[in-house]
């Protein structure tokens, strides 16, 4: 009961932060909460399950739920353009999933390249899709503990790289301004640009991860 009470209080604090200017700590907590929901949704879509301690609390509500819904819909658009890009991410990176440092280092390498030329919401969505793709790979290979590490790693990357950008835009709710097209024949320019670059990010990250000879 105490765990459930603390989880409920934590969830309430996260959602409350959407109603005012968030601190960096709150932005990171929100990033991780969104990451857990994003990963959970992608695992369900793949017919897989994962138990996150924080998910003992009620499903996100209010603005947090809206942000999560938009992130997932934008992620759907990204993945519909080229479905293979965000699948079998571990195989594309040529990494084993038994080592937490290898998995998190690979994720951070890809994340660093995604944002090497600046920050956009398209790239943020891509970051979440990469994390979810790796999470699916981990669960399929009986490494569910790696998912927790990925979510923590995502939060740390947001703290170091995205928090200032997010704060200047008033927080995660800024993504609600993004237009999600319901026309399957239309794809926003920023989505296409993100996808065109992502293959290069994977290749660059692969070479960064090669052992020194």
Swiss-Prot record:
It comes from the Eukaryota. CDD domains: Bcl-2_like (cd06845). The chain crosses the membrane at residues 190-210. It is a single-pass membrane protein. GO terms for biological process: cellular component disassembly involved in execution phase of apoptosis; intrinsic apoptotic signaling pathway by p53 class mediator; male gonad development; negative regulation of mitochondrial depolarization; negative regulation of mitochondrial outer membrane permeabilization involved in apoptotic signaling pathway; negative regulation of necroptotic process; negative regulation of neuron apoptotic process; neuron apoptotic process. SUPFAM superfamilies: Bcl-2 inhibitors of programmed cell death. Changing residue 74 to Q: No change in apoptosis induction. A motif (BH3) lies at residues 67-83. GO terms for cellular component: cis-Golgi network membrane; early endosome membrane; endoplasmic reticulum membrane; mitochondrial inner membrane; mitochondrial membrane; mitochondrial outer membrane; nuclear outer membrane; nucleus. A motif (BH4) lies at residues 32-44. Changing residue 76 to A: Disrupts homodimerization. Positively regulates intrinsic apoptotic signaling pathway. It is found in: Mitochondrion membrane; Endoplasmic reticulum membrane; Mitochondrion inner membrane; Cytoplasm. Keywords: Apoptosis, Cytoplasm, Endoplasmic reticulum, Endosome, Golgi apparatus, Isopeptide bond, Membrane, Mitochondrion, Mitochondrion inner membrane, Mitochondrion outer membrane, Nucleus, Phosphoprotein, Transmembrane, Transmembrane helix, Ubl conjugation. Changing residue 32 to R: Increases protein expression and stability. Increases apoptosis. The keyword Transmembrane applies. Changing residue 25 to R: Increases protein expression and stability. Increases apoptosis. A motif (BH1) lies at residues 113-132. The keyword Transmembrane helix applies. Ubiquitinated by AMFR/gp78 E3 ubiquitin ligase complex; mediates degradation by ubiquitin-proteasome pathway in a VCP/p97-dependent manner; prevents from proapoptotic activity; promotes degradation of newly synthesized proteins that are not ITPR1 associated. The modification Phosphoserine is found at residue 7. Belongs to the Bcl-2 family. 'Matador' means killer in Spanish. Apoptosis regulator that functions through different apoptotic signaling pathways. Plays a roles as pro-apoptotic protein that positively regulates intrinsic apoptotic process in a BAX- and BAK1-dependent manner or in a BAX- and BAK1-independent manner. In response to endoplasmic reticulum stress promotes mitochondrial apoptosis through downstream BAX/BAK1 activation and positive regulation of PERK-mediated unfolded protein response. This is Bcl-2-related ovarian killer protein. The lineage of its organism: Eukaryota, Metazoa, Chordata, Craniata, Vertebrata. The gene is Bok.
